Amino acid sequence: MDKVIEKWDEILQTVKRDYNISDVAFNTWLKPLEVYDVTDNVITILVPSEQVVLINLLNKKYKLLLQVTICELTGISECDVKFISPDEAPQ
């Protein structure tokens, strides 16, 4: 988990650069995301409450890009990304 958290900003910047994501899209969709948990190679990412309705869009547009980049930059051989809302996050 520490590797993903330590490298989170680098992961986001790499996704932006490698996949030519515009500043507007990056600041809207990716920058607000936070790593919530890493368990058994599942990286759970917390989506801000104002973006919860867009979890499906994040899954369609950015999930695979994040998975590939996380694996490349952390050395994790295989990982999955799961987006959750603040309501789904255990307190």
PLM features per residue range, with description:
Residues M1-Q91:
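Intrinsically disordered, low-complexity basic tails and flexible linkers associated
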